[in-house]
Amino acid sequence: ALTDARKGINMFKKVNVDIIGIVENMSYFICDNCNQKHYIFSKDGVKKEAEEFKIPFLGEIPIDTNLRIQSDNGIPALIDNPDGEISKKFISIAKNLKKSLD
């Protein structure tokens, strides 16, 4: 996925399309048994790429079963569980996006 992101970034740069930020999707999951974060695809890879390309890193979205269920049912996480951890992640990303645009 990181290779595809690099290709996309390079393509957008070639055609002079501004990139307003990068979000890392499926960045980690929290184990139901031990409550620990597990980075199964690597850690901070997208953040490092964002720094290298001088693009704002907006945040990360973990792998989350409830988010998948909400998405499958067409119910946004912010509507279904506005105080949940996933909703907080989306709000943080939105705030970081606003900061990068100011």
Language model regions located:
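C-terminal lobe/tail of nucleotide-utilizing enzymes
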Residues: 11-102
